[in-house]
């Protein structure tokens, strides 16, 4: 075997090991972490479909509805901007979904500028401040899909947000496979650059 082939093989093996470690971290974090009753529930946005929230986003919203049904004083921040191919902001579509399911409008607050998970959290912290909450001291629960919880926890820690995390399962195997594999690379990006 030539020297360049050996180097290529070593690099390939190192890349596979790195991907395996990242995927292991994603999988290990796919569980709810609930340690307190939240005063604020932040629901992270996701891509909209032409007729409203995607199935994965609906699951996030349903998870949030389940939580707030047993926490009647918790306020909800729905976070997500408007993508170039989306008919409205993710936050507005999420608010509409919650309202259609009987959630009181005074409990729902929109953060409609975020375009990334880090922005979802950072901008939602600003909404919390505008509502009179201290993001560092206030009990918070962040809702996303289960594949996304490891990175969500990492970003919360880096932003100083002490938050529980609630994960909704993915609606089907195909989207789960894609999301879990994509998340390993997103985790690497945030580990290195955020």
Predicted regions and their residues:
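Short, intrinsically disordered low-complexity segments
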Residues: 2-5, 59, 188
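Generic low-complexity, intrinsically disordered sequence content enriched
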Residues: 13-16, 69, 102, 191
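A structural signal for short, hydrophobic/glycine-enriched beta-strand patches
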Residues: 23, 27-180
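A transmembrane-helix-recognition feature enriched in membrane-embedded lipid enzymes
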Residues: 176-194
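N-terminal membrane-anchoring alpha-helices
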Residues: 1-39
């Amino acid at each position: 075997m030539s020297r360049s082939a050996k180097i290529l093989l070593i690099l390939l093996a190192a890349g596979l090991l790195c991907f395996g470690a990242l995927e292991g971290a994603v999988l290990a974090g796919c569980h709810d972490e609930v340690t307190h009753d939240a005063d604020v529930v932040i629901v992270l946005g996701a891509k909209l479909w032409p007729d409203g929230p995607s199935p994965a986003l609906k699951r996030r919203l349903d998870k949030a509805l389940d939580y707030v049904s047993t926490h009647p004083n918790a306020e909800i921040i729905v976070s997500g901007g408007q993508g170039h191919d989306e008919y409205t902001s993710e936050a507005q579509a999420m608010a509409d979904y919650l309202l259609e399911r009987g959630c009181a409008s005074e409990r729902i607050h929109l953060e409609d500028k975020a375009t990334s998970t880090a922005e979802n959290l950072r901008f939602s912290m600003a909404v919390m401040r505008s509502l009179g909450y201290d993001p560092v001291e206030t009990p918070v629960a962040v809702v996303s899909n289960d594949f996304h919880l490891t990175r969500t926890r990492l970003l919360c820690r880096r932003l100083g947000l002490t938050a529980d995390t609630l994960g909704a399962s993915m609606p089907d195997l195909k989207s789960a496979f894609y999301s879990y594999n994509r998340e390993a690379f997103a985790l690497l990006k945030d580990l290195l650059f955020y």
